[in-house]
Each structure stands twice: as C-alpha cells, then as structure tokens.
A protein has these predicted regions:
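Membrane-proximal helix-turn-helix segments that form the acceptor-binding/catalytic region
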Residues: 130, 137-141, 168-187
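Conserved donor-binding/catalytic core segment of Leloir-type glycosyltransferases
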Residues: 236-252, 258-261, 272
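Helix-loop-beta element that forms the nucleotide-linked donor phosphate-binding surface
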Residues: 188-189, 195-216
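A short helix/loop element that forms part of the nucleotide-sugar donor recognition site in Leloir-type
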Residues: 65-70, 221-235
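Nucleotide-activated donor-binding/catalytic signature segment of Leloir-type glycosyltransferases, i.e.
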Residues: 268, 272-275, 281-307
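A short, well-ordered alpha-helix in the C-terminal region of glycosyltransferases
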Residues: 378, 385-399
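N-terminal subdomain of nucleotide-sugar transferases
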Residues: 2-77, 261
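Nucleotide-sugar-dependent
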Residues: 252, 302-309, 316-337, 342-355
Length: 415
C-alpha cells in the first residue's frame, strides 16, 4: 500500500487542521454514508483542512467497483482496508465478516497514521457498529479531539426492527455507546427527533449535540423528463412512474408499496425499485409469485443513469418503519427534493421527514397500503398537483438543504 501521503511529516504545516476520518464505506462505494463522507471530506479541503480517510475496500454491493489501497481522491488521502471477496449485505454472516475485517484493519492502519504525524481531530460515522469506539479509544490514546456522526442510532434501530439480539449484548453495546458519547467533543445527528432520542434516552448533554441535515446525493437541478428513459422502462403515455430508490433493508416497510401496487392492478401506474438490501430478494419473489405486473426492480445504477430515471419519474416514495422515526432518517428524500420531485412518505406523520414534507407542502404522507392506493388514484385524476408539489420541493431544498451550506456548518464545527 502506498503510504507516501502519510509519511511527509509536519514540515510547513502552519495552521492547517489535520483530520482523520474512519468509516467502512467511502466513494466510489455506493453506500450512502460513504458518499456523504466523501462529500464532507472533499468539501472540508476547501476550508483549509488536510483530510485523511481510513475506509474499506468497496463492498456495500456485490457489484461494488474496485479501488486502490491508497489514492488521493478530490484532495483527500484515502487508505483502504482490503476485503478480499467479502462483498454485499444480503446475509448477516457476510455483513459480520465485513465488520470484523474492517475494524481489525482500520485499527492497525489508523494507529500507523497517528504515529507518523500529528492529527487534530478524529471523526467517525457509524459504519460498522463499534467504529465509534475505535475513534474514541484512539482519541483518548493520542489526546486529540473526537467528533462522532451516527446517521442511525444503534442498537435501538435493530431492537426496534425485531432483531433477536441477546440482552447481554444490547447492554454491552449501550456501555460502549455511553463511552463514545462521553469522549466525543461533539455528536452530529440529522434531525431534531434524533437529538431528542440522545438527550432523553441516552442522557447525552444537549449542548454536545449538533443537528446538520443531509443534502441531495447527487445534488440535482430540476430537469425535464427523459422520454427515451420512460420508453426504456416501458412506461406508457399517461402512466405515473413512482420511484423507490435506496436501501431495501429492515428499516423500510416496503410491503406497503407492493400491496398498494397489487390493489392498483390495471391502473395507469408503474412502481420502480432501484437499489439493494436485505429485503430485495424477498420483494422480487413476492412480486413474481403474485404476478404483480406493474412493479419492477433494478440494481444500483451508475449515477448518470440514476439521474435520468429520477428526472423521468412523477413522484418518489420514502419510507421508515414505525418506531424508527427518531432513530434514523432516509437520506434519499433530499436527492428527490433537489430534482424537484414531489414526495410520498410512508411513515408515522410525526417522523422528521414527514414533518418536512407537510410543513413545506411538497408531498403527502400515508401509513397504509389502502391510503397509498387511494392517494395514487387521486393523483391520476389531478396530475397538476404533482407538478405544484414538485416545484415546492425544489424551493424547499434550495432554501434549507443545499450541500455548500451544510458543508460550511461542518467546517465551522470542526474549527
């Protein structure tokens, strides 16, 4: 592995702040936390930070691209822990092997970098579980600042979704979290609901928590529909194309969408799922077995193709399961809003995402398959409402969730 960027020493460093970031995923991997980490890290270089990232070999999907052990990517020094043939997330055994391999390799690699040069800040996200502990231990050992960014709150998310986790393990995980929160100078969360969970449920001091939401990934302009793409997807004139894109995992009640599609058989609507996750295979088998013709699936798409599909859709679906409203936040909503697409949220109306949509009049919220089917039938009768909500989504995005605005908040926090 090329370590040249880590062996230059500190000569001529001046007042540059040196940041060590640790996360299992990073660009070009398709995992959303890795993509956001890459945006943050490359954005911070324009504010005078020298950024070094310890990450894993791309592995989120079995189709993840190859990447070198070391590269300078958009001004960021990226060091990768090799994963061999451990790729994908469809079964827990593969996930666990990836977690262990990354944590072990990241610990060794981060310690080597910290011995080679002086860092000012360690920053970790939440992939994999316990990477925050790794960051906290290193920060204590080398007496430097530590910032923690949990995009999901674990193990609460897993417990809430019915995972059978031994009580002792949940207790140990809680002890680890308390240590991480104690060592962290700042904890960055995505929403007010997540902050309330940490303050009231985890006893994290409110003054330690910062709220910085997400932005569109990719961040788009409002663009006209691509008729060729609609033809390729076999969407007929007058049909609605409803898009679900992202993780098809345990956090998402996707059966509601499938059930609504089943009730809308023969109507002028198509549902397209793009992405991967633990539920994907099950959903595809259900659609096939029940002969639900207007539902189709695609794997993660290259960015350019995904953008073409997104701008050609009529509305986008965003989900989060009951009980998870204050533990996680589906990030795709911001990409959809940046493209000027109306949003249909399927979740508790008090979830942070549902509140964003309701308060800014850029979509609708439903909780059941009956409600979703009824809404779609109404939209088929009134397509003008789709365009109006889409324009409002774009306006809201520009006012509240632009990437440059939010990266600046990270720069101010870390200085």
């Amino acid at each position: 592995m090329d370590r040249r960027a880590g062996e230059k020493g500190d000569k001529g460093r001046g007042t540059v702040r040196r940041l060590l970031v640790i996360n299992q995923y990073y660009a070009p991997d398709v995992a959303s936390t890795g993509q956001y980490a890459a945006d943050i890290c490359s954005g911070l270089t324009s504010y005078g930070f020298e950024v070094h990232v310890v990450t894993g070999e791309p592995s989120y999907s079995i189709n993840s691209p190859d990447a070198p052990d070391f590269e300078i990517l958009n001004g960021v020094n990226v060091y990768r822990v090799p994963f061999g043939n451990v790729k994908g997330r469809e079964d827990n055994k593969t996930r666990f092997k990836g977690y262990v391999r990354f944590l072990r390799g990241a610990w060794r690699l981060a310690r080597k970098l910290l011995r080679l040069r002086k860092f000012d800040i360690i920053l970790t996200f939440h992939n994999p579980p316990f990477v925050g502990l790794l960051g906290a231990l290193l920060a204590k050992k080398y007496k430097i600042r530590f910032v923690y960014i949990p995009y999901d709150i674990h193990p609460d998310v897993l417990v809430a979704t019915g995972w059978r986790i031994p009580k002792l393990f949940v207790w140990v995980w809680g002890v680890v979290n308390r240590m991480v929160f104690k060592v962290a100078e700042k904890v960055v969360v995505l929403s007010e609901g997540m902050k309330n969970t940490l303050v009231h449920g985890k006893k994290v001091p409110a003054e330690k928590i910062e709220i910085i939401p997400l932005w569109g990934k990719p961040e788009l302009d409002a663009t006209s529909s691509d008729n060729l793409i609609r033809e390729e997807l076999e969407v007929k004139d007058g049909e609605l194309l409803l898009l679900y894109a992202g993780n098809m995992g345990i956090l998402h009640p996707l059966d509601i969408i499938i059930e609504a599609a089943k009730r809308l058989q023969g109507k002028s609507v198509k549902f397209l799922f793009i992405g991967d996750g633990a539920k994907r295979r099950y959903l595809m088998e259900r659609v096939k077995n029940e002969n639900i013709e207007q539902v189709s699936f695609l794997p993660f798409q290259p960015v350019g193709k995904f953008v073409q599909i997104l701008v050609s859709s009529d509305a986008c679906l965003v989900t989060i399961d009951k009980g998870l409203e204050n533990l996680a936040l589906p990030s795709r909503i911001f990409t959809f809003m940046s493209a000027g697409k109306p949003i249909i949220t399927i979740m508790n109306p008090e979830a942070d995402v549902a509140k964003i949509i309701r308060e800014n009049n850029c979509g609708w919220n439903v909780q059941t398959s009956d409600e979703l089917a009824e809404l779609i039938l109404n939209l088929l009768k009134d397509p003008i409402e789709l365009k109006q909500k889409g324009k409002q989504a774009r306006k809201t995005y520009l006012n509240q969730f632009r990437r440059d605005k939010l990266i600046k908040q990270y720069a101010q926090l870390l200085k």
